[in-house]
From Swiss-Prot:
CDD domains: F1-ATPase_delta
UniProt key word Transport: yes
Lineage: Bacteria, Pseudomonadati, Aquificota, Aquificia, Aquificales
Similarity annotation: Belongs to the ATPase epsilon chain family.
Name assigned to this protein: ATP synthase epsilon chain
Length: 134
């Protein structure tokens, strides 16, 4: 077992002893067990699966952030965390459409392009998780 803390800008979402954590990173989905090697990586939009020490499994949708794995402590600092059934599908569809439309504009600055690419990736991941839950 190890300690997992999932934190957003508004506060702690989860803190407790866990057996395993599975999360989506820039390098793909990874699983973390006790005594995992030291790791600092970017979190990308996707599913966060937590298997608690008592066997209970919790699943969340997360957006962008940073994962810090250090011995018996793991910290996930993320922009947003959602219960899978709390994803606002209509809103995410609207944000995805907006991002797709904006990205067709050839006059976007690099900063604007990066913003809308992140928005598109975030919304698409959340929509995929919401549809998988149904």
């Amino acid at each position: 077992m190890y300690r997992l803390d999932v934190v957003t800008p508004t506060g702690s979402v989860f803190s407790g002893d866990v057996y395993q954590t599975v999360i989506t990173t820039a390098d793909g989905e990874i699983g973390i067990l006790e005594n995992h090697m030291l790791l600092l990586t970017n979190i990308t939009p996707g599913k966060l699966r937590i298997e608690k020490a008592d066997g209970e499994v919790k699943e969340f949708a997360v957006t962008y952030g940073v994962l810090d794995v250090r011995g018996d402590k793991v910290i996930a600092l993320v922009e947003e965390v959602f219960e899978l059934d709390e994803i606002n599908v209509d809103n995410e569809k609207q944000l995805l459409e907006e991002a797709n439309q904006k990205l067709q504009n050839e006059n976007l600055s690099e900063e604007e392009k990066e913003h809308y690419e992140k928005q598109r990736s975030r919304s698409q991941a959340l929509l995929n998780l919401a549809s998988a839950k149904v």
